[in-house]
């Protein structure tokens, strides 16, 4: 099968990479990464995979399946267009918007499947298959790879716990402008090493501000890395606000504290005053109610820790093609066509 991994944003890299790994393991597949150069100036896998920044080259590849962890894919590309999502943040309005770009939605777990199947009955132009989320395959394989590094970090800094601060980048939702003093208080009062890992789209002034802050405290470390997953595996507790990484951390069965989360349903400890941070961390670690809530999230949001998520995705794509053939393009209204062309440009079609 000819596969395009459609990488518009940097955060998509480690969502898509497990598909490359499984496609290679299977054999008989050709994989091409489309990398959107306007948003990804330096592609970390440039020496390891076949990739292009050219939409024309992507079209000429004649893909049979396109995997997309974003909201849009050019309608004029051939291939079954598959939405695989960029996280679990169901409270964000755009998570449930059907933009008509996709032939299939491969959902993470029962909670998402139920809602997208309801939407499929309304729109009648896409299918829904529950597969799990591809990054979980990487986690299943590497869950304990960083245990020794974690122990060495704690030993080096002389601390008992690792706390990960992973805020969202959205200026309207982020805790970055108001939480700084209480992160300092946490580092002074608790026996913790604080790792700070920001979203790639975070404003540069906030990045610079917190890098400078970390330089002032021995047990505060600013992490420069495109992937947060490694640090989630090493951390004991997460602090956030309204980020899809909250759910990823809960799926590891680990406690989360948020400041002013906008979620309608809260499965963790949410505070509305940053001064409550230190006490909240103590509470969320020990409280049985939060443990039960995490178990519910695991069962409903993504129970697939078997390491076979991508296998199900590839089989799902092949099954669609067996039944319906390879779509030549996606039928869209003029506005969606215009948006596609404005974002990714035009191509010369083969005659």
For the regions a language model picked out, list residue spans one by one.
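Conserved catalytic-core segment of nucleotide-activated headgroup transferases in glycan assembly
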Residues: 12-27, 135-210, 305, 309-311
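C-terminal amphipathic helix plus adjacent low-complexity
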Residues: 286-351
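Active-site and donor-binding regions of nucleotide-sugar-utilizing enzymes
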Residues: 4-143, 147
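Short beta-strand scaffold positions
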Residues: 35, 68, 107, 240-241, ...
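Donor nucleotide-activated moiety binding/catalytic core segment of transferases
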Residues: 52-57, 202-247
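A donor-sugar binding/catalytic signature common to diverse glycosyltransferases
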Residues: 72, 77-85, 225-268
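Catalytic donor nucleotide-activated moiety binding site of glycosyltransferases and closely related
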Residues: 32-46, 187-222
């Amino acid at each position: 099968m000819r596969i395009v991994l459609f990488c518009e944003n940097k955060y998509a890299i480690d969502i898509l990479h497990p598909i490359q790994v499984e496609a290679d393991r299977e054999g008989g597949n050709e994989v091409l990464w489309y990398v959107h150069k306007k948003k990804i100036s330096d592609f970390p896998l440039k020496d390891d995979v076949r990739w292009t920044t050219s939409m024309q080259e992507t079209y000429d590849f004649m893909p049979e399946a396109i995997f997309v962890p974003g909201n849009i894919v050019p309608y004029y590309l051939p291939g079954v267009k598959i939405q695989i999502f960029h996280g679990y943040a169901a409270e964000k309005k755009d998570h449930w918007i059907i933009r008509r770009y996709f032939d299939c939605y491969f959902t993470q777990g029962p909670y998402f499947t139920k809602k997208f199947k309801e939407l499929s009955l309304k729109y009648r132009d896409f299918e829904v298959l529950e597969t799990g989320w591809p990054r979980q395959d990487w986690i299943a394989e590497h869950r304990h790879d960083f245990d020794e590094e974690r122990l060495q970090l704690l030993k080096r800094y002389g601390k008992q716990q690792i706390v990960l601060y992973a805020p969202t980048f959205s200026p309207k939702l982020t805790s970055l402008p108001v939480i700084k003093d209480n992160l300092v208080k946490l580092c002074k009062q608790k026996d913790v090493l604080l790792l700070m890992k920001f979203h790639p789209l975070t404003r540069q002034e906030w990045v610079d501000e917190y890098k400078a802050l970390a330089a002032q405290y021995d047990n505060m470390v600013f992490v420069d890395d495109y992937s947060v997953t490694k640090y989630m595996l090493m951390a004991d507790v997460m602090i956030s606000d309204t980020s899809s990484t909250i759910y990823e951390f809960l799926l590891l069965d680990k406690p989360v504290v948020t400041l002013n989360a906008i979620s309608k349903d809260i499965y963790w400890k949410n505070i509305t005053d940053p001064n409550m941070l230190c006490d909240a961390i103590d509470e969320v670690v020990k409280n049985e109610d939060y443990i039960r809530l995490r178990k519910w999230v695991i069962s409903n949001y993504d129970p697939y820790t078997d390491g076979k998520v991508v296998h199900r995705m590839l089989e799902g794509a092949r099954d669609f093609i067996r039944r319906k053939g390879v779509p030549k393009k996606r039928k869209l209204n003029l506005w969606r066509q215009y948006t596609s062309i404005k974002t990714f440009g035009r191509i010369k079609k083969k005659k």
